[in-house]
């Protein structure tokens, strides 16, 4: 009976550990590289970087700066 409880407990511990690994790799923090919005935690993918509050206007401003206009 003791062997059965130990093996069940070990099995459950492995399941919990695997769930924690998946949850910690679920999303990227602000400032990390991304390709899609779902990769970012509480932010969106803005020009390849997770950013909070990225708008099309900010993207337009960066584009104008790259062409030397203000």
From Swiss-Prot:
Residues 58-70 form a propeptide. GO terms for molecular function: toxin activity. Its main location: secreted. InterPro entries: Conotoxin-I_CS (IPR013141), Conotoxin_I2 (IPR020242). Expressed by the venom duct. Pfam families: Conotoxin_I2. GO terms for cellular component: extracellular region. Belongs to the conotoxin I2 superfamily. The cysteine framework is XI (C-C-CC-CC-C-C). This is Conotoxin Lt11.6. It comes from Conus litteratus.
């Amino acid at each position: 009976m003791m062997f059965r409880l130990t093996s069940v407990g070990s099995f459950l511990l492995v399941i919990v550990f695997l769930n924690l690994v998946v949850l910690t790799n679920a999303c990227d923090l602000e400032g990390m590289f991304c390709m899609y919005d779902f990769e970012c935690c509480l932010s969106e993918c803005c020009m390849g970087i997770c950013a909070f509050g990225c708008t099309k206007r900010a993207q337009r401003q960066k584009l104008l700066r790259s062409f030397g206009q203000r």
